[in-house]
Amino acid sequence: MVKLRLQRTGTKHDPHYRIVAADSRSPRDGKFVDIVGHYHPAQIKEQTTFNKEKILTWLKNGAQPTGTVLNLFKNAGIWAEYKTTLKK
């Protein structure tokens, strides 16, 4: 099963995360299939960048977001957009 999840990068005490599509059996920082965004929580205003087209494609193909990634998608409005495409 493919999951959309966070992959930690950055240095000690300064985490940066990639939002990746990866096999659920691979380790957190292991192999991934595709990078769909970035998340920098340590900045004053949390900075996130998304490739919306890739994310919607992965979701439509059955990828499951983890809890944290789902919250990021909800805050950015991507999850609502995905839900409206399902109803059509």
Curated annotation (Swiss-Prot):
One Gene Ontology term from the biological process aspect of the record: translation
A GO CC term assigned to this protein in UniProt:
cytoplasm
Q: Which domain of life is it from?
A: Bacteria
Q: Which cysteines are joined by disulfide bonds?
A: none
Q: Which InterPro entries match?
A: Ribosomal_bS16 (IPR000307), Ribosomal_bS16_dom_sf (IPR023803)
Give the molecular function GO annotations.
Answer: structural constituent of ribosome
Q: Which UniProt keywords apply?
A: Ribonucleoprotein, Ribosomal protein
Spell out the HAMAP family in the cross-references.
Ribosomal_bS16
Q: Which family does it belong to?
A: Belongs to the bacterial ribosomal protein bS16 family.
NCBIfam families in the cross-refs: S16
**Name under which the protein is recorded:** Small ribosomal subunit protein bS16
Name of encoding gene: rpsP
